[in-house]
Amino acid sequence: MKVKICGITDVETAKHACEYGADAIGFVFAESKRKITPGLAKEIIGEIPVHVFKVGVFVNESVEVIQKIAEECGLTHVQLHGDEDNHQIRRLNIPSIKAVGVALEKDIECAKKYDTDYLLFDSPKEKFHGGNGKTFSWELLAHMPNELREKTILAGGLNILNIEEAIRTVQPYMIDVSSGVETEGKKDLKKIKQFIKKAKECSK
């Protein structure tokens, strides 16, 4: 099971997460308490292994700005968490992840229209897009066709206590965590290590 740690804002946490087995590190460039500058993201990316996905999270940003930041920082993927459509997705010259809020089964059907490399299924949008620590009904994803499952990233309120059930129910390509590995709003290295270990064990 691949694991993405999102909302990283410092070199030490990023390096430790990779040492613990993280497959992807997420940098939030949209409005959020975890927002990061391109300069700091570039510094962190320069310190983590080449094979790890470096994902930039954007919300309703222009293609031009996304591409500029991606090139400046060395991002390998961009995650689109707003109302982006296929016209915008196809203009990107970098692999993409389209986030979709799931409340009903029809949300999954609608997600199939996106011409993207990966689909990230998350809890429905609130004030901030993603990172709100709330789960949704994983059963809605339990019967996906394999071709969709193979490009699915599961997010939304995941933590050490519920990832076993989440992985067993959805069997996604990757799981994504942010607030579930934080203590008082800050990334907790102990929680990151435990989360990654548990996720890898669950998928054996």
UniProtKB/Swiss-Prot annotation:
UniProt keyword annotations, A-Z: Amino-acid biosynthesis, Aromatic amino acid biosynthesis, Isomerase, Tryptophan biosynthesis
Domain of life of the organism encoding this protein: Bacteria
One GO BP: L-tryptophan biosynthetic process
Pathway(s) it belongs to: Amino-acid biosynthesis; L-tryptophan biosynthesis; L-tryptophan from chorismate: step 3/5
MF terms in GO: phosphoribosylanthranilate isomerase activity
Catalytic activity: N-(5-phospho-beta-D-ribosyl)anthranilate = 1-(2-carboxyphenylamino)-1-deoxy-D-ribulose 5-phosphate
EC number: 5.3.1.24
PANTHER family: N-(5'-PHOSPHORIBOSYL)ANTHRANILATE ISOMERASE (PTHR42894:SF1)
Classification via NCBIfam families: PRK01222.1-3
HAMAP family on file: PRAI
Similarity annotation: Belongs to the TrpF family.
The name this protein goes by in its record: N-(5'-phosphoribosyl)anthranilate isomerase
